[in-house]
Amino acid sequence: MRFLPVGDSMTIGATGDFTWRYRMWQHFDTFPGLRYEIVGPRTTLYDTGANAPVSHAYADPSFPPAARRHLSGWGEGWLHMAPVIADAVREAEADVLLVSLGLIDLGFYTDAEQTAANARAFITAARTANPRLRMVLLPVIPNVRAVTDAPFAASCARFNDLLAKAVADLDEPSSPLLLASRPTAYDIRTDTYDGTHPGPTGEHKLAAAFADAMHQAWELGGPYAGLPAPALPLPA
């Protein structure tokens, strides 16, 4: 089974990150009976100094080059991925898409309705390359901007409602769609390093959202076992 991660800056990661893609590879690798490959046209991280996706400096240098493959980009959203997803699926011969998109769209490019329309266009285009393609879609996780920007927070909530409707409308037995649950107890104060981009605990929680959705719906792999233990309360 060939998995293609698709996303924005939360998925590509930056220099020195592990990324949730790394956590997903670790998860897949715990199941000897799961024949899998991670595919995609890109392998790099984003270098904020160079302002370009040119870094190979993952936090764990032993992350296998073949497992680093993805289709994600800093500042890229549904708007950018919808026109290129068919070629990416076709060239990679992908079977499953793991998609985390929408925050960038809502923050900079499109409103909730336009973003949902682009998500639908993405799904339709991807299926032209593989009519039996499976997709797991992660809802938007509002970032720190939503704390003080009520219209933006409302736009994120509205888009998530529209994404759920798109999944219900477009789901097909031959090409199933899964809407993953928002990661359990995800807290931008502790699970990100800047209010948006996941740190180690956030990476685990994003990977768990995808892994648990696939296990529960498709009996693929198993429950995610890599979540860090919750911090113990300080003594009184």
Residue map of PLM features:
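Substrate-gating cap/lid alpha-helix
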Residues: 142-181, 200-204
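Histidine-centered active-site loop/cap adjacent to the catalytic His
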Residues: 4-6, 191-236
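Solvent-exposed loop/turn segments at secondary-structure junctions
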Residues: 9-13, 42-48, 103-108, 141-146, ...
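Active-site segments of SGNH/GDSL-like serine hydrolases
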Residues: 98-107, 123-158, 183-186
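Sec-exported extracytoplasmic/periplasmic mature domains
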Residues: 11, 15, 25, 29-33, ...
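Conserved SGNH/GDSL esterase-like catalytic core that processes O-acyl groups on lipids
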Residues: 4, 10-117
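Surface-exposed patches in mature extracellular/periplasmic domains of secreted proteins
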Residues: 31-43, 134-138, 179-181, 220-226
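Active-site cleft segment of glycoside hydrolase catalytic domains centered on the general acid/base Glu
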Residues: 83, 107-122, 147-159, 192-201
